[in-house]
């Protein structure tokens, strides 16, 4: 008898988690949904029955006993507060926030890359990587296994759903506000008022913002998204000295993050070898031209535009493009795949 809980069940990623649990016929006999007091009491249909959403703020260790796996997508603050409570009650927590990713006692797992790390639980918590890192890992791990990864230069083009519902609503409202005046931007970037900038530094509609995430106050002038890319790649791949530089860009796309990756290796690796490796890789689909629209709604990371990097000698460099659904594999799916590993 397996009991699973979804914490943050009414949020953007929580909704995808619920859908995937049904689609994948997750082997749970009992399912419990938790959310903030604002959503508590609401009834959600799941597998033909209605489940009442429980108030996370009222949870106690006693009331949580019997839960085997808890899937968290309620934000870092809630995770820090409640994940240890669920773990103390006997659940294994799989957390989708950034709260635990840097903790040396919490494994950071991509299901296709380092599943065995689930056996190294100290706190009863497993962390899910950032959605941008997630898209790249199933692609980079088999290439690393073949040629030894030593350096990454990455530019990411991140969808507004990565900013939560506020990002989605901001883009939709700005497009509507500009309306038929959009063509006037051809000659004048100030020709129409897009309205409130929402969670961004400038209007996102008809624009590109080379500033995804929040500025880290450590003198590097990097955003937290850029630092996550570096820190998480090192931890997941088990390469603490991997050199990683990145620029994270927010683009007016609803769902689907795209990355251009310049990868340098210790050994030579040709385009043909890379294509053969990636064609057989789990969680990867080899395509000619990856796009966020094509990636939205599917499980795999799309990879294509694979070229030899002419700036790296001896065929030790590759350039490639990756697109992945930041809500699906980038958040909800990997969380559930980890849960599937736990209940096998």
Curated annotation (Swiss-Prot):
Give the molecular function GO annotations. aspartate-semialdehyde dehydrogenase activity; NAD binding; NADP binding; protein dimerization activity
Protein's GO biological process: 'de novo' L-methionine biosynthetic process; diaminopimelate biosynthetic process; isoleucine biosynthetic process; lysine biosynthetic process via diaminopimelate; threonine biosynthetic process
EC identifiers of the protein: 1.2.1.11
Which sites bind phosphate?
A: 101, 228
- InterPro entries attached here? Asp-semialdehyde_DH_CS, Asp_semialdehyde_DH, Asp_semialdehyde_DH_beta, NAD(P)-bd_dom_sf, Semialdehyde_DH_NAD-bd, Semialdhyde_DH_dimer_dom
- Enzyme class (EC, first level): oxidoreductase
Q: Which residues form the active site?
A: 131 (acyl-thioester intermediate), 257 (proton acceptor)
Is NADP found in the keyword set? yes
Q: Which residues cross the membrane?
A: none
Per UniProt, the keywords (alphabetical) are: Amino-acid biosynthesis, Diaminopimelate biosynthesis, Lysine biosynthesis, Methionine biosynthesis, NADP, Oxidoreductase, Threonine biosynthesis
User: In its keyword annotation, does this UniProt entry include Iron-sulfur?
Assistant: no
Q: Identify the metabolic or biological route this protein is part of.
A: Amino-acid biosynthesis; L-lysine biosynthesis via DAP pathway; (S)-tetrahydrodipicolinate from L-aspartate: step 2/4; Amino-acid biosynthesis; L-methionine biosynthesis via de novo pathway; L-homoserine from L-aspartate: step 2/3; Amino-acid biosynthesis; L-threonine biosynthesis; L-threonine from L-aspartate: step 2/5
Q: Which residues bind substrate?
A: 158, 250
Q: Which positions does UniProt annotate for NADP(+) binding?
A: 10-13, 38-39, 161-162, 326
Catalytic reaction equation(s): L-aspartate 4-semialdehyde + phosphate + NADP(+) = 4-phospho-L-aspartate + NADPH + H(+)
Summary of the function given for this chain in its UniProt record: Catalyzes the NADPH-dependent formation of L-aspartate-semialdehyde (L-ASA) by the reductive dephosphorylation of L-aspartyl-4-phosphate.
Q: How does it assemble?
A: Homodimer.
Sequence similarity: Belongs to the aspartate-semialdehyde dehydrogenase family.
Cite the NCBIfam families for this sequence: asd_B (TIGR01296), PRK14874.1 (NF011456)
Q: What is this protein called?
A: Aspartate-semialdehyde dehydrogenase
Species in which this protein is naturally found: Corynebacterium flavescens
Q: Taxonomy-wise, where does this protein's organism fall, top ranks first?
A: Bacteria, Bacillati, Actinomycetota, Actinomycetes, Mycobacteriales
> What is the primary gene name for this protein?
asd
